[in-house]
Curated annotation (Swiss-Prot):
Catalytic residues in the record: 475
Gene label: betA
Annotated family: Belongs to the GMC oxidoreductase family.
Keyword Oxidoreductase attached: yes
Pathway stated in the Swiss-Prot or TrEMBL entry: Amine and polyamine biosynthesis; betaine biosynthesis via choline pathway; betaine aldehyde from choline (cytochrome c reductase route): step 1/1
Keyword presence, Oxidoreductase: yes
EC top class, as a word: oxidoreductase
Coiled coil: none
Cofactor annotation: FAD
A GO biological process held by the record: glycine betaine biosynthetic process from choline
Protein name: Oxygen-dependent choline dehydrogenase
Organism encoding this protein: Staphylococcus aureus (strain MW2)
Function: Involved in the biosynthesis of the osmoprotectant glycine betaine. Catalyzes the oxidation of choline to betaine aldehyde and betaine aldehyde to glycine betaine at the same rate.
């Protein structure tokens, strides 16, 4: 053991998205000593695979960048195990993700605020924190929806490839709308996306928040520091033990904040005796606080790629030629421009698949190339694809430790496709996507569907394809959800971010989300952490901003969703 007498005001477990925000904001108080413990390595400036936007497919599945999690056999996916990439570097998954910045719909946060005690998490209270974190280069300076001076610098997708414009036009031909900013007044519709790319480099949470703060004398950031144990005296956390370079180090803490993400936070809680008492006893762990919601309510977004052959030589398919990659890479190294300087998810859309939902339940990412996330490209000279899937499925999963060993990965199951509603929306998702991709605007480029292929038509054929081909969109959340103490499944007090029943143990990360949002979740996690930082510091919260936002049937005549062939049970 070493560092036995070292004490900190705040120990933050996890240097990912939320941990980076907290490390910066909490260390703004110069009289507070802050320690961030990150189990992965540093996000080196020279590391092309995490700094180069177009290299995003390389870290996934690579043990140097990815913790390489997997679900158990998913019972409704034909027993498949679904791989889950989790960032193994400073910045966490913000250092290996797709860099897409989506706030979610304002009505997501109205849903968060519905339970008694959650009122301060509605859109009006969250909006100022979104604006605080953003520097939106694509927004007008007078835009009251967007932030202009925050640490996260956002690039509006130029979407200049002709395939993007044809896709947006196809959405209009199918009966939808265009929208200039899916993070602004109107999410519903088709248009350019914001990306966390600045001057040709990935804008991770660590780059935006942690690195600028590291010069502060009261902030310490330790990488390759794997937390093995949280120490307690009754209901109070007193410190942590972590392993680094083969040695154990124990430090004292006035407060411990879990920011390990939707996998590691519930795992550490269960290892600490916080969770379902009977389950913990079955693993030989003495229960400390009975909170059956720890590891439950687990949500994720599943997605598929609908791929098409492109008749015109306008796609990015040739850039996947291994002979061209060195030249593309050199251009990026010396100029930070070219094909490698974009994540290429420069546009897409949000729509409702049926009239039973109040706001978009489908998200489309359009890509002017036909390639899987693992880098496997379609066998065509030119292609394009749409990523699609239901955004607020009612399927719920769980995470459970397998033993008392902190190094053993937990048992994970999301129960994808486990409900009739989930299956219904999946069938609708594929039919809505096909309807858009078959519009006249796509005719100059549409060389035919590659995947799933024209032979997949019936409800069951579609669902069978999803079972075989569906992949995670890498948005796990809600496994230690916020909620009032009256909710037996709530884990975190929404007013303090403290674990129910504990005095100084807090949770700030995606696991605390009460339910997922209808898009990529990195932006909501940053917002949650910004808001939590003010709570932890005892600062007056930012004033809520009550401004109008788009609701279908209220702001235009679009009273219903576009009709597609209905799902038949």
């Amino acid at each position: 053991m070493s560092n036995k007498n070292k004490s900190y005001d705040y120990v933050i477990i996890g240097g990912g998205s939320a941990g980076s925000v907290l490390g910066n904001r909490l260390s703004e108080d110069k009289d507070k000593e802050v320690l961030v413990l990150e189990a992965g390595r540093s996000d080196y400036f020279w590391d092309l695979f995490i700094q180069m936007p177009a290299a995003l497919m390389f870290p996934s599945g690579n043990k140097f960048y990815d913790w390489i999690y997997s679900t158990d056999e998913e019972p409704h996916m034909g027993g498949r195990k679904v791989a889950h990439a989790r960032g193994k570097v400073l910045g966490g998954s913000s250092s290996i993700n797709g860099m897409i910045y989506q706030r979610g719909n304002p009505m997501d946060y109205e849903g968060w605020a519905e339970p008694e005690g959650m009122e301060t998490w509605d859109f009006a209270h969250c909006l100022p924190y979104f604006k605080k974190l953003e520097k939106t280069y694509g927004a007008a300076p007078y835009d009251k929806f967007r932030g202009h001076d925050g640490p996260i610098k956002l690039k509006r997708g130029p979407a200049t490839n002709p395939l993007f414009q044809s896709f947006f036009d196809a959405g209009v031909e199918a009966g939808y709308h265009k929208t200039p900013d899916v993070n602004g007044f109107r999410q519903e519709g088709f248009g350019p996306f914001d990306s966390q790319v600045h001057r040709g480099r990935r804008m991770s949470a660590s780059r935006a928040y942690l690195h600028p703060a590291m010069k502060r004398k009261n902030l310490t950031v330790e990488t390759r520091a794997f937390v093995t144990e949280i120490h307690y005296e009754g209901r109070r956390a007193t410190g942590v033990t972590y392993k680094k370079n083969g040695k154990l180090h124990t430090i004292d803490a006035k407060e411990v904040i879990l920011s390990g993400g939707a996998f590691n936070t519930p795992q550490l809680l269960q290892l600490s005796g916080i969770g379902d008492s009977e389950f913990l006893k079955s693993k030989g762990i003495e229960p400390r606080v009975h909170l059956p919601g720890v590891g439950e309510n687990f949500e994720d977004h599943l997605e598929v790629y609908i791929q098409h052959k492109c008749k015109e030589p306008v796609s990015l398919q040739p850039s996947l030629d291994i002979k061209r990659m060195p030249f593309i890479g050199l251009q990026w190294i010396f100029t930070r421009t070219g094909a490698a300087a974009s994540n290429h998810f420069e546009g897409g859309g949000f729509v409702r698949s049926n009239n039973e939902v109040d706001y978009p339940n489908l998200m489309f990412h359009f890509l002017p190339i036909a390639v899987r996330y693992d880098g496997q490209k379609a066998a065509v000279a030119h292609g394009y694809q749409v990523h699609v899937g239901p955004m607020y499925s009612n399927s719920r999963g769980s995470l459970k430790i397998k033993s008392k060993d902190p190094f053993e990965k937990p048992s994970i199951r999301f129960n994808y496709l486990s409900t009739e509603e989930d299956k219904k929306e999946w069938v609708e998702a594929i039919r809505v996507a096909r309807n858009i991709l078959s519009q006249k605007a796509m005719d100059p480029f549409n060389g035919g569907e590659i995947s799933p292929g024209p032979e997949v038509q019936t409800d069951e054929e579609i669902l069978d394809w999803v079972r075989r081909d569906g992949e995670t969109a890498l948005h796990p959340s809600c496994s230690a959800k916020m909620g009032p103490a009256s909710d037996p499944m709530a884990v975190v007090d929404p007013l303090t971010m403290k674990v129910h029943g504990m005095e100084n143990l807090r949770v700030v990360d995606a696991s605390a989300m009460p339910r997922t949002t209808n898009g990529n979740i990195h932006a909501p996690v940053l917002m949650l952490a910004e808001k939590a930082a003010d709570i932890i510091r005892g600062r007056k919260p930012l004033e809520p901003q009550y401004i109008d936002y788009y609701k279908h049937g209220v702001h235009d005549e679009n009273e219903g969703a576009i009709e597609v062939k209905p799902y038949a049970k």
